[in-house]
């Protein structure tokens, strides 16, 4: 099974991806996480350091694939999750899609691409050009990380459009949305009402999720010394269980940008009255 995780830049995709990878490993699966971001920090919370990228390794070998060994590019992370960082082209030059393609090509050359139960692509930001939409070419499911905000859901809608486009050529489904560190979900609910898709999980506003990124540890590793965090791990285990059940998923219909802008902005400008306030108002009118 191959997963591609997308979402607005800074929304917490890498933190979410790392914890999902560990959750899948806890369920007995052999997992490979591939970071698809020139910053090459996707697997930081799994390994505790910035591992060398595949592109850097290939350059050091003059692109002689036969001189590259699995241990040159695959690093063992927390919980037994294997980690790879694709890296990226020089800033302002090249194409990220080419880098992803070279990464998959090398892993296949090493007979590593088909050795895993789950491969998770953690893809940078909300860039959905042909290049950074490339992981969708290999994925069975796409997961979109969002919050309860306008910008994140606007980005989610554009990513959903990419899933719809890629689903024309191979079996690809949107597994659903993951709400990350959000105190409310009313805007998320408004969006999925307009654009039907599953919501896999809503993680509340938990400061330890942000802290885990700074510490370079997953929530599972932090919970080893602080059992009070086990309840946070349960959110990720729930996501893993849903994925392993191979959900039907959806080919999202999406919404035109202008329609979505009107829908979400109207939610902000004309919020629904508080339920308690509405009941009080009705009593006053009796």
Swiss-Prot record:
What catalytic reaction does the record list?
chlorophyllide a + oxidized 2[4Fe-4S]-[ferredoxin] + 2 ADP + 2 phosphate = protochlorophyllide a + reduced 2[4Fe-4S]-[ferredoxin] + 2 ATP + 2 H2O
> What is the required cofactor set for this protein?
[4Fe-4S] cluster
Which InterPro entries would you find in this protein's record? NifH/chlL_CS, NifH/frxC, P-loop_NTPase, Protochlorophyllide_ATP-bd
Task: List the PROSITE patterns.
Answer: NIFH_FRXC_1, NIFH_FRXC_2, NIFH_FRXC_3
Cross-referenced Pfam families, in alphabetical order? Answer: Fer4_NifH
Q: How does it assemble?
A: Homodimer. Protochlorophyllide reductase is composed of three subunits; ChlL, ChlN and ChlB.
Q: Which HAMAP family match?
A: ChlL_BchL (MF_00355)
What's the protein called, per UniProt?
Light-independent protochlorophyllide reductase iron-sulfur ATP-binding protein
Give the species this sequence originates from: Cyanothece sp. (strain PCC 7425 / ATCC 29141)
Per the record, the gene is: chlL
């Amino acid at each position: 099974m191959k997963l591609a995780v997308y979402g607005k830049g800074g929304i917490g995709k890498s933190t979410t991806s790392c914890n999902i990878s560990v959750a899948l490993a806890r369920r007995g699966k052999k997992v490979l996480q591939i970071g698809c971001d020139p910053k090459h920090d996707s697997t930081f919370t799994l390994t505790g350091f910035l591992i060398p990228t595949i592109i850097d390794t290939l350059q050091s070998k003059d692109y002689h694939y036969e001189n590259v060994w699995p241990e040159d590019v695959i690093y063992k992370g927390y919980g037994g999750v294997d980690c790879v960082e694709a890296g990226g082209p020089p800033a302002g030059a090249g194409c990220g899609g080419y880098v992803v393609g070279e990464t998959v090509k090398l892993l296949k050359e090493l007979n590593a691409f088909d050795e895993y139960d789950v491969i998770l692509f953690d893809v940078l930001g909300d860039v959905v050009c042909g290049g950074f939409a490339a992981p969708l070419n290999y994925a069975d499911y796409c997961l979109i990380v969002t919050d309860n905000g306008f910008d994140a859901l606007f980005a989610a809608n554009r990513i959903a459009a990419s899933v719809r486009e890629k689903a024309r050529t191979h079996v690809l489904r949107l597994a659903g949305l993951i709400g990350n560190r959000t105190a409310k979900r009313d805007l998320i609910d408004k969006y999925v009402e307009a654009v039907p898709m599953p919501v896999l999980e809503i993680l509340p506003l938990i400061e330890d999720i942000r802290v885990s990124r700074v510490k370079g540890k997953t929530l599972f590793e932090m919970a080893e010394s602080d059992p009070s965090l086990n309840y946070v791990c349960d959110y990720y285990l729930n996501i893993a269980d849903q994925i392993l059940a191979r959900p039907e998923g959806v080919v999202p219909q999406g919404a035109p940008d202008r329609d979505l802008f009107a829908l979400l902005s109207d939610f902000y400008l004309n919020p629904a009255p508080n339920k308690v306030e509405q009941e009080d108002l009705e009593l006053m009118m009796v």
